[in-house]
């Protein structure tokens, strides 16, 4: 590949990686938010359990609801992690495609140049 081809490829790949980083950061932020909410729920579970025991009440329904919410939030985290993996894979494919296109363009230019030189030598 010629220097300019390499520069174009580097620019395309940098753009690809930047877009990938932005998309991944959105999901990482969502994961962080879910993890914080889970921590709050753990605290609420402890408080609800203590209060129920201290007052001699049954907190099963409240605790079950909070446990379900934690499970739901953990499921969201898994979904977000899958999305991040998909973004990484798509970015990698895009960069591989960029490289293949750049190599094909360079090869086509080299073949055209060789054909032109062959034409000149025949004259």
Where does each model-flagged region fall?
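Alpha-helix N-cap/helix-start motif at coil-to-helix transitions, marked by capping-box chemistry
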Residues: 1, 5, 35-43
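Amphipathic alpha-helix face/heptad-repeat signature
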Residues: 30, 34, 66-69, 73
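Short E/K-rich amphipathic alpha-helical oligomerization segments
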Residues: 39-67, 71
């Amino acid at each position: 590949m010629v220097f300019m081809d390499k520069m174009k490829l580097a620019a395309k790949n940098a753009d690809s990686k930047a877009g990938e980083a932005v998309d991944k950061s959105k999901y990482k932020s969502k994961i962080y938010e879910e993890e914080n909410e889970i921590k709050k729920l753990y605290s609420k579970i402890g408080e609800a359990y203590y209060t129920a025991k201290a007052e001699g009440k049954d907190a099963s329904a409240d605790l079950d609801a909070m446990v379900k919410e934690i499970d739901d939030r953990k499921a969201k985290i898994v979904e977000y992690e899958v999305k991040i993996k998909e973004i990484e894979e798509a970015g990698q494919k895009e960069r591989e495609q960029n490289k293949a296109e750049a190599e094909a363009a360079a090869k086509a230019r080299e073949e055209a140049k060789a054909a032109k030189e062959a034409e000149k030598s025949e004259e």
